[in-house]
Amino acid sequence: MQTQSLNQTSYVFRTENLNVYYGSNLAVKNVTLDIPARQITAFIGPSGCGKSTILRCFNRTNDLIPGARVEGKLTYHGKDLYAKEVDPVAVRRRIGMVFQRPNPFPKSIYDNVAYGPRVLGMKVDLDEVVETSLKRAALWDEVKDKLKENGQSLSGGQQQRLCIARALAVQPDVILMDEPCSALDPISTRRIEELMKELEEEYTIIIVTHNMQQASRVSDMTAFFSVELVGSNRVGELIEFDRTEVIFNSPTKQATRDYVEGRFG
């Protein structure tokens, strides 16, 4: 495994020897990396290598999985994300998540975006939050005249942008994306990718993707994970982490080169 400190001045997350277990089974081992602020970091690697497992550590949604536990160090803006006094709900407000398949609530477009601020009791102008969030998600012009319609009536690509708007409405610091385009057509995928590049001016974004072309197009940094058999258990590990152009053009690890050139995984 290679761990590499990068010449960046500001890090949102830093992990050190991070291990994730499901019950007694080790799922991912010894992950050490620094996530730079206001850049897009991509996690790539074969199925089962722990990309999504590590992603869920960053907003503590692994806490919701029975038997899951994290060992090692994970800091968010220099503070221990797993300290006893840290409220996981507050963490998830600051660190939003967009899932593999669009999952709008069975509510109006307006109520989908307003849901988070309402639940959190945020003292904001909801009309303004809804409009601003939809504009940032590049959806406003398509839905501004039908905000009362059900969010589930939108196309798949529109639904995913609605989910992004819903995440933005609670004013997060980080956006996690777990295969956000895997269920979308190429045109919708390109729109989401363009949106990500716009959003990185204000937000730190981490994306899990099996699409290496997507990782090379949108990300600034790339982490390559792989998997090894330990007995009968598949254990994920970080192999290499560097600038995206390095990972795709001149990686230092042969396993990385084999993967990005299509000879593995």
UniProtKB/Swiss-Prot annotation:
Class in the EC hierarchy, top level: translocase
Binding site for ATP: G45, P46, S47, G48, C49, G50, K51, S52
GO MF terms held by the record: ATP binding; ATP hydrolysis activity; ATPase-coupled phosphate ion transmembrane transporter activity
UniProt name for this protein: Phosphate import ATP-binding protein PstB 2
CDD domains documented for this protein: ABC_PstB_phosphate_transporter
Location of this chain's protein in the cell: Cell inner membrane
EC id: 7.3.2.1
InterPro entries: AAA+_ATPase, ABC_transporter-like_ATP-bd, ABC_transporter-like_CS, P-loop_NTPase, PstB-like
Catalytic reaction annotation: phosphate(out) + ATP + H2O = ADP + 2 phosphate(in) + H(+)
Organism annotation: Synechococcus sp. (strain JA-2-3B'a(2-13))
Gene Ontology BP, a term: phosphate ion transmembrane transport
Gene name per UniProt: pstB2
Keyword DNA damage in record: no
